[in-house]
Regions:
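Conserved N-terminal substructure of TIR/SEFIR domains
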Residues: 1-64, 92-94, 173-203
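C-terminal interaction surface of TIR/SEFIR-family domains
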Residues: 3, 16, 108-203
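Short acidic, S/G/P-rich loop/turn micro-motifs used as interaction or catalytic elements
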Residues: 11-15, 72-75, 106-108
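Glycine-rich, phosphate-binding/catalytic loops in enzymes
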Residues: 22-24, 82-86, 117
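Short loop/turn segments at strand-loop or loop-helix junctions that form parts
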Residues: 33-36, 68-70, 103
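Conserved TIR/SEFIR loop-to-helix hotspot centered on a Trp-containing motif
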Residues: 72-89
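Conserved beta-strand/loop subsegment of P-loop NTPase cores
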Residues: 95-102
């Protein structure tokens, strides 16, 4: 089993995170490393200071990040920091693989096969997409509503990130997605748009 960090909107999507952890306890899919020690006070911190704090503390033991995407996940600065830090390949704490889980609140119906063979091993029978089928930022937004821009711009550059819907999860599918993310994490090149420094609350 791989060590996994779960990134999500704590106020709105805690119930899904708790449900995923209970499900994992039943099926023994991953080792949960998502310890939450409270928000980081980023006053007077540079982007690199934040990245080091997240990577060296919150993500230190994990090798794969599971991102739970709800309607407001993309607006949370701490989620953006966790994604940035997961993608960053530091000398001591190396980059992580990433798997995206679209929550029912997004209304998403599509999946994304980010790794070789997943169309058949994971996404057979679903409305799957690949980089060959999506060309623009708008294409990704239309197929995957509420997906954070940091994920979109990296998918557009060919990053090996898979996307599955909450309702399509099975133990075998999630195990395969985590394994693939781990196995390809050192073969993925990420790009790093500027980190979000403020939360935005549309509602």
């Amino acid at each position: 089993m791989h060590r996994v960090f779960i990134s999500y909107h704590h106020r709105l999507d805690q119930g899904y995170k708790d449900a995923l952890c209970r499900w994992n306890e039943q099926h023994h899919i991953f080792i949960d490393e998502s310890v939450y020690d409270g928000d980081i006070d980023d006053t007077n911190m540079t982007d690199d200071d934040i990245r080091k704090a997240i990577r060296d503390n919150n993500l230190r033991k994990s090798t794969v990040t599971l991102l739970l995407v709800g309607q407001q996940t993309q607006y949370r600065k701490h989620v953006d920091w966790e994604l940035y830090s997961s993608m960053y390949d530091a000398p001591i704490n190396h980059r992580s693989g990433i798997v995206v889980i679209m929550l029912p609140t997004t209304g998403c119906k599509c999946t994304f096969a980010g790794h070789d063979g997943e169309i058949y091993s994971v996404f057979r029978g679903t409305d799957w997409q690949t980089n060959n089928l999506l060309a623009t930022n708008s294409d990704y937004q239309n197929h995957f509503p509420y997906l954070p821009n940091r994920i979109i711009v990296n998918l557009m550059q060919g990053a090996k990130i898979s996307i599955i819907n909450w309702d399509d999860l099975t133990p075998s599918r999630l195990t395969t997605l985590i394994d693939n993310a781990y196995n390809d994490k050192d073969n993925t090149t990420y790009i790093f748009p500027k980190m979000r420094r403020y939360n935005y609350n549309p509602q």
